[in-house]
Every structure is written in C-alpha cells, then in structure tokens.
C-alpha cells in the first residue's frame, strides 16, 4: 500500500501542464514532455500519439532503450528526441491534418505519466482574382471571381459602390478542400456593361485581412 501511495504521489508531481503550440503550414515545431524526476535511464519507454475523435489514440512513434521507431504513415513528418528528462516530438506541419491534440506517454516500470499538448496549424491568407466574359453572342456580362485560400476560417466578400445601375450580383462559388488540407472559398461577381466601376474583394482569415480592387479588367493590390 505504501508503495502504491508513493507511486500516486510521484505521478501527481510528474505530470506537466499541457501547452498550445501554433505552426504555419510547412513549419517545423517541437512539442515537449518533461518528467520531473532525479534520474531516468534508457529503460524508460516513451510513446507519442495523435488523438482522434472520442478516445482514439493513433501511435506516431516510440522510444525505448534510446532506440526510436516511427510508424510508417508518420515517417518524414515526425521525429522523437530526448535530452535528459525531456522528450521531444518534432513535427513538420506539412498538412492541416497535423492540427490537433497529441499525447506523450512515459512509462517506467509500473509507473506511467502522460502529458497532452495541442498543435494549431494555420495557413496564411492568399487572395486571387480572375475574370471571364459571358459567351457569344452578347458578351454583355463580366464575371469576376475572388478566391481566398487559408486555414482555419477563410472568408471572402465583394464591396461595391452604392446606387450603381444595373447593379452587380454576387454568387457564392462554394468551399473546396485543397490537397494540403486548407480551404479555398470563392465568390463570383457578375458585372453588366459598363464594366468600369471599381469593386473591392475582401478576404479574411481570423485576424488576417487582404484587399483586391478590380477596375476595368485590372486588379490593383
């Protein structure tokens, strides 16, 4: 019983508080786990997991007797290192799917300690505009599309002068998920002749904002 109580006290003193880490897409970051103990030999077993929905834990890799093994799907994007009593998971955030919660499990004999960290992967906003005329025979409408690519919350809208006749009309082009996991949002603006009025596309992603002004077939930044 005394041994059991001692292990519980050790467990309580060894669990470090979780941290939130933010990485831009493509950036390399490090998640850290620390065991507050006088000395840890190579016999400690350390495992890092990616947490999924519910109770799902997907093993990324493990280290035991200073031998490191990374599971096949995570090779090239994850690595494990150690410095004394501190254990590192190095993440190359190459995809938005690397966003989420991670768990480090440290086990020595019958004692087990866990620590959870959160990684937020973001992609800076990019804004693009292109135009296309309506088809033969009238060529009377110019459709201008504004696309914003970002993560986690891309948003796009057109700003137009008031009182313009005939008034331009906007239509949501939908949301598309890119290969890197980021999101692209597009809004089409239909401009009847004449096409010379200036319109402004505004793209946002949380605290980011970008503008593109479209005038007579030209986009000025």
Curated annotation (Swiss-Prot):
SUPFAM superfamilies: Immunoglobulin (SSF48726)
Keyword annotations from UniProtKB, A to Z: Disulfide bond, Early protein, Glycoprotein, Immunoglobulin domain, Oncogene, Repeat, Secreted, Signal
Gene Ontology CC terms: extracellular region
Gene3D superfamilies: Immunoglobulins (2.60.40.10)
Record flagged with keyword Disulfide bond: yes
Primary localization: secreted
Domain Ig-like: 21-120, 124-220
Transmembrane regions: none
PTM annotation: Phosphorylated on serine and threonine by host.
Compartment(s): Secreted
Entry keyword Glycoprotein: yes
Signal peptide positions on this chain: 1-20
Coiled coil region boundaries: none
Glycosylation sites: 95
Gene Ontology terms for molecular function: identical protein binding
Residue pairs linked by disulfide bridges in the UniProt entry: 146-201
Main function: Plays diverse functions in immunomodulation and oncogenicity, maybe by acting as a functional receptor for human CSF1. May inhibit interferon secretion from mononuclear cells. Exhibits oncogenic activity in vitro.
Subunit structure and binding partners: Homohexamer. Interacts with human CSF1.
Full protein name: Secreted protein BARF1
Species this protein is from: Epstein-Barr virus (strain B95-8)
